[in-house]
Amino acid sequence: MYYLILFALGAIWGSFANVCIYRLPKNQSVIKGRSFCPHCKKKIQWFDNIPALSFVLLMGKCRNCKKSINLQYLIVELLSIFSFVAIYHFFGLTVTSFLLLILSIFFIIIFFIDLKHFIIPNELTFPLMIIGFIKSFDPNLNTTIFPNYIYSLIGGVFGYLIIWSIIYFYKKVRNKEGMGLGDAKLMAAIGFWFGWTSIPFVILMSSIVALIFVIPSLINKSRKISSEIPFGPYIIIGCILYVSFSNEIKNFLF
């Protein structure tokens, strides 16, 4: 029963995530206004806006103009459903689960916005920092994953400064921008959520994953070595790996 409820909630929040992914880069309200087709601008009726199901029933096309609907909408909703179900499966009905559900929605939105627009909006990173720090004052949370407020504060500062220093020295050496401050703020948010010990692992894993995806495109020359790369998605993947293996990592280190 709980799995069905989490499935439905994941689908609903995945639909909202799609709204944020489309509207935030355009500085549009994510609360006001009904959803509409990006091609013909016709407002979408409720029966065509059922998360995941409507995409399948409409065969990925707008009912009005018959233009293809971006597959991203289905992927985001399925990812959200998977996140909700997986978090409940591993952490149960706990405050830790609730916090991780919030984080998962933020991560999905940031992932696709940065992937498409090469930006990470402050409207996403600042709330993440605040939530991450405030929750660190709760002594009843899962301390294997979440740090106390001291380590949370150190993590936030450390996460921001280490990415900021990379940006600074890269610009000094190459005389051009590398990573953006959005990446620094995202890493700061991760530091606030998971403490300073998470930062080295997240940076290492995000760099490895980025290389795995980028090197083949450099070899086949579909991407130039000077091409801009959205690093936010790789940071998020690194953070997910950290949360997934936090017990093993801390046992190994400490």
Kindly give the residue locations of the regions a language model identified.
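Generic alpha-helical transmembrane segments of integral inner-membrane proteins
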Residues: L4, A8, I12, F16, ...
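Membrane-proximal soluble regions of multi-pass membrane proteins
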Residues: A17-Q72
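C-terminal ends of transmembrane helices
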Residues: N18-R23, M59-K67, F107-I119, W164-K176, ...
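Select subsegments of transmembrane alpha-helices in polytopic membrane proteins
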Residues: I69-V76, N122-L124
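Transmembrane helix-loop-helix
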Residues: I87-L99
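Functional transmembrane core segments of multi-pass inner-membrane proteins
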Residues: S97, I102, I109-V209, F252-F254
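Interfacial loop-to-transmembrane junctions
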Residues: G180-G182, P216-L241
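Juxtamembrane boundary at the C-terminal end of a transmembrane helix
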Residues: S244-F254
